[in-house]
């Protein structure tokens, strides 16, 4: 029986468990620094070095051993079970044969070839959290040199030694007692670790913060809700800005050439109730372009001004360089929760295009020439109003992808409407309590349906659609490959592969568990693997 080496860290009851007899090559690989060149590399191949694979957010792998002609022969290679998570939302990160995954507040290093545990950093889940934070969600890690970074449910940023899992430092970057939490994977840019928070439904004031990757010292913080006297503060009378929402609960993307970070923000607070926050409610439901060195705002674009429907704008901002309307452009593409796909010039935030991608859409008639929605009279009422898309949105945080060969964007859409209710008197903010001013109900007899959409940004419409069978409640995202395949978790617990050009189904594997995560791909010793989390397990697949 193998001996376990327990090493207690100085911050709370935390342990790193290292498995003796680890493969020497893995130890050597983990000791190698993740260099700036590694972080800048794109598209990913053997290494899937960050949540989205690379800075662009495109989730496109250059590996092509697995392709449309042989993907039907994929077999499960290994399954790793985590101990403390009911439903993983993590995307594994792989560097030189070592895989890093998270579950609640735990981090694991695995042999990416065999699934064998190399080390385990254990941390108890936090008590007393509310809303999203109380679900103890963790979506993954970031890498830099020989360090691993993760957020915890109570908004701490941890720095771990990649070789052992031992704690290097621990920084509390928000106060959980004031309703803050964290669910995201961090993003490393240069020598800074960028983090965001959850709690936008609970009356927190959102921000993006950057910490020194070496020391954990705060470098800068950008508040997404402006204080009195700052640009955009007119929406927030008195002290309402302190509880205005606009959280940053998914990682952003980064353009090294422009030196700009792109980060999405969530809905305003109180949720569904606009009388106490008249105006556009900046900078909620936005994509922000920030300077990674200073945190200075370069530009912003707001998708849903004065949001009454919980249409967060945190969906991944895809960075795509391609011809658009006769010119080569640096584009930012986002399929938004409000039901529209947007295309912006990411150099300056100029609005270029928007189109609906769901049929069930009644809150707006369209998008005007400046990118603002043309609103209808639909809004929450005391008696209830049918609103489309519903509370879960026409899409959500589940990852989109972009294939460089097909030039199509792939994402999961949801056809759904719900009944929204408002309260005659808005509630006041209180700590340790959700800050909702309404509720939503499903509409009896009106089912929801998930659909995988391939969107042609040049034509401005869907190239194909692949309807799902299931409840409509899954949160699985996509990944695409140079082999011409789109991988995704479907709404009926299966990991699927379809032809990226046509949507033709090619392969599926029933995991027997809900899939609430997005897939990735990596290579070890010349062999390509694809992996996805389902339930409490991580599955890895390869050709025979």
Task: Specify the residue positions occupied by each region the protein language model found.
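Phosphate/diphosphate-binding loops
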Residues: 316-358, 362-363, 379-390, 395, ...
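Beta-propeller blade signature
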Residues: 160, 164-165, 206-218, 277-296, ...
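Structural motif
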Residues: 203-207, 272-273, 284, 340-342, ...
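Aromatic (tryptophan-biased) beta-strands that constitute blades/sheets of beta-rich domains
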Residues: 19-82, 116-130, 166-175, 217-225, ...
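Hydrophobic or amphipathic alpha-helical targeting/insertion segments
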Residues: 112, 117, 139-173, 178-224, ...
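Conserved blade-register residue in beta-propeller folds
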Residues: 109-111, 159, 210, 289, ...
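Repeat-blade elements of multi-bladed beta-propeller folds
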Residues: 48-52, 85-106, 131-156, 181-205, ...
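Loop/turn-rich, solvent-exposed surfaces of beta-rich toroidal or solenoidal domains
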Residues: 321, 414-415, 444-504
């Amino acid at each position: 029986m193998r001996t376990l080496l327990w090493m207690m860290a100085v911050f709370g009851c935390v342990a790193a468990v290292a498995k003796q007899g680890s493969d020497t090559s893995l130890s050597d690989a983990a000791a190698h620094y993740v260099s700036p060149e590694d972080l800048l590399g794109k598209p990913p191949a053997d290494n899937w070095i960050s949540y989205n694979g690379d800075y662009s957010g495109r989730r496109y792998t250059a590996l092509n051993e697995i392709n449309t002609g042989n993907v039907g022969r994929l077999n499960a290679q290994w399954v790793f079970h985590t101990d403390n998570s009911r439903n993983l939302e993590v995307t594994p990160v792989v560097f030189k044969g070592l895989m890093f995954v998270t579950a609640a507040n735990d981090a694991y290093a695995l042999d990416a070839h065999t699934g064998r545990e190399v080390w385990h950093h254990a941390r108890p889940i936090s008590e007393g959290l509310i809303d999203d934070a109380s679900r103890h969600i963790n979506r993954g890690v970031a890498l830099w040199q020989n360090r691993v970074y993760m957020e915890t449910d109570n908004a701490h940023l941890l720095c771990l030694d990649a070789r052992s899992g031992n704690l290097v430092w621990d920084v509390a970057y928000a106060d959980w007692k004031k309703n803050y939490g964290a669910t995201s994977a961090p993003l490393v840019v240069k020598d800074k670790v960028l983090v965001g928070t959850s709690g936008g439904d609970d009356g927190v004031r959102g921000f993006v913060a950057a910490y020194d990757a070496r020391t954990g010292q705060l470098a800068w913080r950008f508040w997404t809700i402006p204080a009195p006297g700052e640009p955009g503060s007119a929406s927030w009378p008195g002290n309402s800005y302190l509880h205005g929402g606009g959280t940053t609960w998914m990682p952003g993307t980064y353009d090294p050439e422009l030196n700009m970070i792109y980060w999405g923000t969530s809905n305003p607070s109180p949720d569904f109730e606009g009388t106490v926050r008249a105006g556009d409610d900046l900078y909620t439901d936005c994509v922000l372009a920030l300077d990674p060195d200073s945190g200075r705002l370069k530009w912003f674009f707001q998708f849903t001004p004065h949001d009454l429907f919980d249409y967060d704008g945190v969906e991944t901002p895809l960075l795509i360089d391609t011809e658009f309307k006769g010119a080569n452009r640096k584009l930012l593409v986002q399929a938004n929760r409000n039901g529209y796909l947007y295309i912006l010039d990411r150099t300056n935030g100029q609005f270029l295009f928007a189109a609906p991608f769901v049929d069930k859409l009644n809150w707006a008639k369209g998008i005007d020439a400046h990118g603002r929605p043309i609103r209808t009279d639909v809004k929450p009422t005391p008696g209830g109003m049918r609103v489309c898309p519903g509370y879960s949105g026409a899409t959500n945080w589940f990852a989109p992808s972009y294939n460089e060969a097909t030039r199509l964007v792939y994402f999961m859409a949801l056809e759904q409407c719900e009944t929204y209710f408002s309260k005659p008197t808005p509630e006041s903010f209180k700590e340790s309590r959700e800050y909702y001013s309404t509720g939503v109900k499903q509409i009896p007899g009106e089912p929801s349906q998930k659909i995988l959409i391939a969107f042609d940004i040049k034509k401005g419409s869907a190239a194909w659609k692949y309807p799902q069978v299931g409840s409509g409640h899954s949160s699985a995202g996509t990944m695409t490959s140079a082999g011409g395949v789109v991988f995704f978790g479907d709404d009926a617990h299966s990991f699927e592969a379809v032809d990226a050009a046509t949507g033709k189904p090619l392969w599926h594997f029933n995991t027997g568990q809900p899939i609430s995560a997005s897939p990735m791909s990596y290579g070890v010793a010349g062999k390509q693997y694809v992996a996805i989390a389902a339930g409490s397990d991580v599955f890895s697949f390869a050709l025979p």
